[in-house]
Amino acid sequence: MPRKIEEIKDFLLTARRKDAKSVNIKKNKDNVKFKVRCSRYLYTLVITDKEKAEKLKQSLPPGLAVKELK
């Protein structure tokens, strides 16, 4: 089931959880979507600023599987 996250800080807390398996990054021409798969929900964060998206990509936990989709 999908859930939407509005804040970057909440997304980072969700990505650091023990049940977080992977992160998918979908890039469009006007926004970037970060989707983190946890045991129950797929959490989605939509960012319209490309620079913030790059910073967030660098601050993801190192043990998480990151997959970039075009």
UniProtKB/Swiss-Prot annotation:
Instruction: Please give the superkingdom of this protein's source.
Output: Eukaryota
InterPro entries (UniProt xref): Ribosomal_eL38, Ribosomal_eL38_sf
- Acetylation in keyword set: yes
Main location per the UniProt record: cytoplasm
Q: Which Pfam families match?
A: Ribosomal_L38e
Q: Which residues carry this modification: N6-acetyllysine?
A: 9, 67
Family per similarity comment: Belongs to the eukaryotic ribosomal protein eL38 family.
Q: Subunit details for this protein?
A: Component of the large ribosomal subunit.
Q: What is this protein called?
A: Large ribosomal subunit protein eL38
Q: Which organism is it from?
A: Oryctolagus cuniculus (Rabbit)
